[in-house]
Amino acid sequence: MYRRSYVFQARQERYERAQPAGPTAQPGGTAPGLAALQALGERVAAQVQRARALQQRHAGLRRQLYAFQRLGEQPGPEEALARHVEANLQRARDLAAEHARLERQEAEAQRALDEFRSKYENECECQLVLKEMLERLNKEADEALLRNLHLQLEAQFLQADISVAKDRYKKNLLEIQTYITILQQIIQTAPQVSLVTGGMREEKLLTEREVAALRNQLDEGREAVTHLQAQKAELQAQTTALEQAIKHAHECYDDEIQLYNGQIENLRKEIEEAERSLERSSYDCRQLAVAQQTLRNELDRYHRIIEIEGNRLSSVFIETPISLITPSHGASLSLGSNVKDLTRAVQDITAAKPRQKALPKSLPKRKEIIAQDKVDETLEDAPLKTLQEPKAVQGELTGDGDSQLGAGGGHEVSPTQEGGPEDVPDGSQISKAFGKLCKVVKERVSGHKEPVPEPPADLFTKGRHILVTGESSFVDPEFYSSSIPARGGVVVSIEEDSMHHDGHVEPSPGQPMPPVENGQGVPQGREGAHSNHQQVTDKNGIRAKEPKDLEEKDDDSRKDDEAGRRPCPVIIPGPDGPSTTHSQTSGSNQGGPEGPGSKSSSLLAKSPSKALSFKKV
């Protein structure tokens, strides 16, 4: 009982302490003395209630103490238990009475709380109303203050204006006084009245005349104004009519103007597109020009490389025995699909490089470059003359070749022997290439088919290599520019020249034949001046070269430098180039122990006289 009453009392005190903090926490309280008084009354009431609770607890403890004392005094347990039960019943009755009293106190406290809450709400509303009123009054006071300041400023300005007006009026007054004094002096010194009246009459007459003239002018001005007003009305009518006509014209021509604007925009776009396409075309033309120059340089370089490699490998062709080909004099070979294999084999042969690249150049290569320089000089001087006398040039070429080859029969010096082991090609690559070449030649010799014209092949350059597309043939090629130029490409057209069997051939410039000087009584002149080296050029551009005498070694170093700067002639074979090539190669290889002169003479005897096409690159 004591614990429950103590807990209830503590909770009630905590609630009472928390409740008064509400109204005092509101800002802007208007009655601090009333709040302090209420708080003091509440604290007094709390202390009174606490004292009552302590008294009740004290009374309960005293009763419990008396009960325990009586229980200790009673000898019988039944009586003690009965007394204890009675005490408990009494305590229950007391607790019930206490509970009823506490309920009444709770109801009273609830009513007091409701009253206090209503009062608090009223106070809050009053505070809000007062706050709004205070704000409104502050605003009104601020506005009044601003108006007061404005009025003060206006009063100051008015005061300044008043002072300025006073000064101005004083000055005017002084001026008026001075005028009055001056008029008084004038009146005192004025003439008689009769003179003044006469002058006034004359002035009156003059003024009347002026008034009449002014009236006439006024009437004329009125008439002019009326006339101008009529003209103005007429002009306004005309302007309205013109405005209506202009509006009508605008409405009529709006569609046409829009159409013309659209056409103008389209034309402008087309012009811009044409300008862009022109810029692209000019850029493409510049690129094509650069590519053309690059291709020309590449072609010159490749022609020089192929010429040098062909001259270097011609010695290998002469010294290597190939006894597999024995074609007849007039056999016609096929130009079919095996041409690609033949071209690939020749490319493999020309791609063979010397093993010892660090060694100096051999003597045959230097002499081949010297022979190329002589061929260039001859080709620059001889074309016009050979076109006029084709048969004579051909006979001279055949006769000189036979005589020079016959004279050089006893002088056997091979280029590979002069070069020595310093300039040895790659044997494995050459053997593979010769194997492929032999297979291709066997297949071509075994069949007798008519030459089929091949479609033109396109040559494209990429970097420092040449890519050949399509199947080319050994007919006479010719470079030309197509109507639709390919980007970075060279188009090659293939033309077939019909060969006549009556001995008439295409005129071609004669090849220079360096004679062999062996001391056996050869004729002097152009054939006998340099008889150490013989050069035979066949239809497909492979030249069989023999070494010159050692007397020209002093000029080799000078002519090696000139060979790199001069343009190389490109010898393009005719339609029957492959058959002539292989027959000459087989004839030169079947010579056996005979000298180079006999090999070349047999080669010229077996090969028919055909035309050679030269193109200066």
From Swiss-Prot:
Comp. bias (Low complexity)? 596-617
Q: Where is the composition biased (Basic and acidic residues)?
A: 540-565
- Region: Coil 1A; residue ranges are 34-68
Location of the protein in the cell: Cell membrane; Cytoplasm; Cytoplasm, Cytoskeleton; Cytoplasm, Cell cortex
Where in the chain is the site Cleavage (by CASP2, CASP3, and CASP7)?
A: 426-427
Which Pfam families does the entry link to? Answer: Filament
Q: Which residues carry this modification: Phosphoserine?
A: 5, 334, 508, 607
Q: Where is this region: Coil 2?
A: 195-313
Keyword terms, alphabetized: Acetylation, Cell membrane, Coiled coil, Cytoplasm, Cytoskeleton, Eye lens protein, Intermediate filament, Lipoprotein, Membrane, Myristate, Phosphoprotein, Repeat
The record's region (Coil 1B) falls at 78-177
Query: In chain numbering, where does the site feature Interaction with MIP fall?
Result: 450
- Looking at the record, the residues that make up the IF rod domain are 33-313
Which stretches does the entry tag as region Head? 1-33
Q: How is it modified after translation?
A: Proteolytically cleaved during lens cell fiber differentiation with increased fragmentation as fiber cell age increases.
List every position bearing Phosphothreonine: 580
Q: Where is this site: Cleavage?
A: 34-35
Outline the segment boundaries, as ranges, of region: Tail: 314-617
Covalently lipidated residues (N-myristoyl glycine) read: 427
PTM N-acetylalanine: list the residues. Answer: 35
Bilayer topology term:
Peripheral membrane protein
InterPro entries according to UniProt = BFSP1 (IPR042358), IF_rod_dom (IPR039008)
Does Membrane show up as a keyword for this record? Answer: yes
User: From its record, what is one biological process in GO terms?
Assistant: lens fiber cell development
Q: Report residue spans for region: Linker 12.
A: 178-194
Q: Subunit composition?
A: Part of a complex required for lens intermediate filament formation composed of BFSP1, BFSP2 and CRYAA. Identified in a complex that contains VIM, EZR, AHNAK, BFSP1, BFSP2, ANK2, PLEC, PRX and spectrin. Found in a complex composed of PPL (via C-terminal linker domain), BFSP1 and BFSP2 in the retinal lens. Within the complex interacts with BFSP2. Interacts (via C-terminus) with MIP (via C-terminus) in aged lens fiber cells.
What is the official name of this protein in its record? Filensin
